């Protein structure tokens, strides 16, 4: 079963593109081992509610398999290393 990676962001967040890029690079490297979802909390009530459910107070935030793992944008290496340790 693939590891679920959720990246919470907003359109106005200056650091969110780096987090999204790290997640996309992780997907490129790890392929079907991970499932990446980008959730813009300012574009969807469902995404906003999911952020509330996780008690997210800042963006970017990366949730892996239901646990908040990174608040702020990790480097590509940090995210990939974390995901590889979970495989």
Describe each region flagged by the PLM:
Residues 15-18, 61, 75:
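Hydrophobic residues in alpha-helical membrane-spanning segments
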Residues 14-15, 45-46, 78:
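Short alpha-helical
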Residues 52-63:
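Structural micro-motif
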Residues 64-87:
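Non-catalytic, surface beta->alpha helical segment in thiol-disulfide oxidoreductase systems
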Residues 11, 40-43, 68:
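Structured beta->alpha junctions
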Residues 1-29:
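Local sequence-structure signature of Cys/Sec-based thiol-disulfide redox active-site neighborhoods
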């Amino acid at each position: 079963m693939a590891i679920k990676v959720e990246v919470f962001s907003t359109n106005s967040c200056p650091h969110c593109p780096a987090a999204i890029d790290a997640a996309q690079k992780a997907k490129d490297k790890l392929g079907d081992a991970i499932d990446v979802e980008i959730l813009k909390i300012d574009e969807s009530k469902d995404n906003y509610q999911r952020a509330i459910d996780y008690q997210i107070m800042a963006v970017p935030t990366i949730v892996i398999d239901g646990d908040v793992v990174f608040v702020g944008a990790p480097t590509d290496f940090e995210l990939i290393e974390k995901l590889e340790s979970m495989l």
